[in-house]
């Protein structure tokens, strides 16, 4: 464990996250972990390492003094990231050196940005995860003055790589039916698919409000027993405005669930900012399984999709560290 970054300034919602918890639902603890799992796995792929802990930055990052040479990876929401004032590419891995200053400002698009470091951030773990779950009082919310430590970097030479932005899409979000979907009329389900929702102001890691001029409230006073809920479930409270659950959702709920977002599309819900348009499309369970398998293959192949960053020499603060004359000849070889 090596001290790597000293926190000068920090946003109000910067936390340590990883893949979250497995098998804790029955104990009342939701999966938690990164709100955008695709961005998390992109960080892992860029760094060429396994399931390490990262910083999740909601809306705003912070300013960090570099205490140890390291590699960092940025993914998720595009933020104004700079190293000694020079802009850093998102969805890419970069090298940082002792004495430099890393600044990560406001998000330009999306909500959750991710900062990973070679070896991962080392923080206390609970039941196998370093994730922060504010509702359960677990994990770490990063504070100014704090020193962040990293583990052993197993691939220090892997740097200067980027991933294409594969997560942006304006296509409808794929949903499948739940045990409650049949309680809604055919006309109401059709309206649900046809409605262009906007992501409401109300939202956090527990879930986001879906606003429209339509009401999807059930009539007839059906009584729904409290049942297990998971991220992706779309609940419809009494007023009829749907609410999509995210990583830190409660584990049980008594509102009817009109649909459930496929896990591969949950990151798009999480990254929607207030006012963004969202549409939903029902797919069969068989189609959903095929879509999820294709997404799993894409994620497993992320490391292979990393390509070298094409950089402008005028923007390279570490120019002297590069081999710029490789392949020179004397002239008498012809």
Regions found by a protein language model. Give the residues of each.
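Conserved "landmark" site that anchors the functional core of diverse proteins
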Residues: 1-334
């Amino acid at each position: 464990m090596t001290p790597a970054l000293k926190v000068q300034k920090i946003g109000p919602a910067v936390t340590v996250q990883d893949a979250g918890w497995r098998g804790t639902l029955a104990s009342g603890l939701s999966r938690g972990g990164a709100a955008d799992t695709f961005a998390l796995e992109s960080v892992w792929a860029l760094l060429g390492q396994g399931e390490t802990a990262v910083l999740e930055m909601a809306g705003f990052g912070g300013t960090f003094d570099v205490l140890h040479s390291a590699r960092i990876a940025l993914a998720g929401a595009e933020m104004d990231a700079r190293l000694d004032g020079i802009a850093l590419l998102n969805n890419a891995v970069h090298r940082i050196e002792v004495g430099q200053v890393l600044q990560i400002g406001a998000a330009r698009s999306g909500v959750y940005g991710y900062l990973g470091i070679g070896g991962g951030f080392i923080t206390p773990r609970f039941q196998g995860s370093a994730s922060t779950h504010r509702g359960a009082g677990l994990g770490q919310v990063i504070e100014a003055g704090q020193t962040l430590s990293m583990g052993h970097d197993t691939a220090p030479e892997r740097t200067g790589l980027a991933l294409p932005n594969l997560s942006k899409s304006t296509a409808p979000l794929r949903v499948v039916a739940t045990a409650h979907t049949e309680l809604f009329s055919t006309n109401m389900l059709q309206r649900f698919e046809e409605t262009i929702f906007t992501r409401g102001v109300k939202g956090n890691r527990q879930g986001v409000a879906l606003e429209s001029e339509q009401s999807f409230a059930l009539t007839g006073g059906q009584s729904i027993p409290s049942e297990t809920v998971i991220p992706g479930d779309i609940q419809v409270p009494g007023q009829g405005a749907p609410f999509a659950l995210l990583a830190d959702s409660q584990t049980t709920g008594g509102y009817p669930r009109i649909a459930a977002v496929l896990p591969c599309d949950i990151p798009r819900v999480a990254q929607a900012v207030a006012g963004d348009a969202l549409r939903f499309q029902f797919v069969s369970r068989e189609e959903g399984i095929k879509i999820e398998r294709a997404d799993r293959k894409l994620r497993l192949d992320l490391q292979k999709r990393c390509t070298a960053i094409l950089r402008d020499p005028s923007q390279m603060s570490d120019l002297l560290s590069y081999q710029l004359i490789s392949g020179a000849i004397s002239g008498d070889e012809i």
